[in-house]
Curated annotation (Swiss-Prot):
Its main location: cytoplasm. This is Thymidine kinase. Coiled coil: none annotated. PROSITE patterns: TK_CELLULAR_TYPE. Its EC number is 2.7.1.21. It is found in: Cytoplasm. It is an enzyme of class 2 (transferase). InterPro entries: P-loop_NTPase (IPR027417), Thymidine_kinase (IPR001267), Thymidine_kinase_CS (IPR020633). It comes from Shouchella clausii (strain KSM-K16).
Length: 192
């Protein structure tokens, strides 16, 4: 019986490389998968899942008007699993489409992404994944500044100063965001 999985973690917790590992495991057994990623993620190139260790793979980009269910249903070869990177950028409608893939097409769906933004607010996609997922798993990483578990994401400006207000979505990597614990989110030991 297929299920909807949500695997979340702070920045740098290995979400993208986990997608590539899962895809490889299926494909080694001659079981095709379908990989999607947000069309908003332009850090590397639109339509790619890229990990910080240098591995990358083509993926179907999701835009606001993308109907993920229709795309999967129209595939000539049914995938054994659907993998979604950057699930936090999805809309409620997208998440409902993922649930429909599981419930109607009986295909497992694994969504990977951030749970909360730099203000410690839920992303829309993450909120609805938390509500609709059958299984939820935290992917752990350590705080950039201390030894505690990172549960938040700290955004910094060009001078390295922490930012706590602004637009929720700003695409960036290690130069813009740090995985941090709660204490270091409030009082980051940054030298400016």
């Amino acid at each position: 019986m297929a299920q909807l999985f949500f695997k979340y973690g702070a920045m740098n917790s290995g979400k993208s490389i986990e997608i590539l590992k899962v895809a490889n495991n299926y494909e080694e057994q001659k079981k095709p998968v379908l990989i999607f990623t947000s069309g908003m993620d332009t850090r590397d190139e639109v339509g790619y899942v890229s990990s910080r260790v240098g591995l990358r793979r083509r993926a179907v980009p999701i835009f606001d008007d993308t109907n993920i269910f229709d795309y999967v249903e129209s595939c000539r070869q049914k995938p054994y699993c659907v993998l979604i990177d950057e699930v936090q950028f999805l809309t409620k409608a997208h998440v409902l489409q993922l649930a429909n893939i599981v419930d109607t097409l009986d295909i497992p769906v694994m969504g990977f992404g951030l749970k909360n933004d730099f203000r410690n607010e839920l992303f829309e996609g993450s909120k609805y994944m938390l509500l609709y997922a059958d299984k939820i798993e935290e992917m752990k990483t350590i705080c950039w500044f201390c030894h505690k578990k990172a549960i938040m994401n700290l955004r910094v400006d060009e001078q390295g100063k922490p930012i706590y207000d602004g637009e929720q979505i700003q695409i960036g990597g290690n130069e813009t965001y740090y995985p941090v614990c709660r204490k270091c989110h409030q009082h980051p030991p940054l030298t400016v």
